Amino acid sequence: MIRTAFIIAATLATFAALPAQAEDATVGSLKISAPWARATPKGASVGGGYMKITNTGTAPDRLIGGSTDVASRFEIHEMKMDNGVMKMRPVTGGLEIKPGETVELSPGGYHMMLVGLKQQLEQGQHFKATLEFAKAGKVDVDFAIESVGAQRPGTAGGAMPGMGSMKMK
C-alpha cells in the first residue's frame, strides 16, 4: 500500500515537472508551432511571446498583428544590433514569411510584445492569443508559459541558445 502510494506520488511529481506544452495551429498554408511565452514577475507591464511560423504555400504572407485577453496591446518587435548596442523596435508593415521558409520568433530576435499586461504570466499556465496574417487571416493559438529566463520551450531559465549539448568541466 505504501509502495503503491509512493509510486503514484513519484509519477505525479514527474508529470508536474514537465514543461507546459502548447498545440500547433494551422491557418491557410501557415503552420504555427511551439508557441510559448516567458513567465513574468508580479507587476510586470510587458511580456514576450515566441513561436515558429512555416509557410508551406507558394505565396508570401505577413504576420500583421494579433490580440490577447492578457494584454492591452499585441505588437510585433525585432531586436537588432546597432553600432554595438542591442535595440528593440516595432516591425512596421508586418513580419514576412516567404514561401517554403520558417520564421522563428525567439528571444533576442523577432518576438511578439505583450504591452499592458492585465495579469501575471505564470510558469506552467497557458493563454490564448489570436494571430492575424495579411492573407491567411486570423488563427487562435494557445501559448504555454515557460520560466522567466527560458530561451526556448522546455529549457530552464538562463539557458543560452545552442548551449544545451555542451559538456562543462
Where in this protein do the model-derived segments appear?
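Compact, glycine-rich, soluble single-domain proteins
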Residues: 23-169
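Sec/Tat signal peptide C-region and signal peptidase I cleavage site
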Residues: 18-22
